[in-house]
Amino acid sequence: PKTWATKNGIAAGSIVYINQGDNGALTLSTDRSERDLRVKLDIREKTGDDLIRDIIGCYVGGYRIIEVTSQHMSPAQKKDLHQIVNKLIGPEILEETINKVVIQDLLSSEELQSEKALRRIRTVVKSMIHDSFASLLNNNGDELAMDVIQRDDDVDRLNLLISRQFTEILRTGSVKQE
C-alpha cells in the first residue's frame, strides 16, 4: 500500500523482504532483522557429505539459527552435526533432542572483519607451505605434516567465515567500516 511505502521510505528500486511465517502468513519488511535469519532444515536420512553441505549452505547463506530436524536423528547424524559445527566459526549447538538440533551463530556481525581474516589466511598458508617442505626434507616430519593438516582446517574455517561475510554484505547492501 502507498501509505505504508511512504511511511517506510520505500521508493522505486527499494528492497522489500517478504517472509513466510509458520502459519503461512506473509509479512513485508524493509529490513531483514535477526529473527528473519532462522531456517528449519529437515534432514530425513541424510548423513555425511550431504548433511555437511546443507549445514554449510545455511551458514554461508547467513542464517543465524539453524533448526535441524528429523523423525528420529541417528547417532551418525548427530556426530556429523557436531563435527561440522566444530569446523565453523561462530555457530554452537544450543539444543539437542532425539529429533531436533538447534544451531545458533553466537558471533556478532559487528565483530566480523574480512580483511583481518584474509590476512590470517595468508599468514597461515605461507607457514603451511614452508612447513610442508620442511616435513618432506625431514626424516621424521610426520608430526609437522599433521600440524599442516590441522592448519588447513583452520584455513577452511576462515574461508567459510569470509564467504558468510560476503553473503551478509550482499544481503544488507553495506560494508561495515573497520
Q: Which residues are covered by each model-predicted region?
A:
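Cytosolic, long alpha-helical scaffolding segments
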Residues: 3-16, 20-178
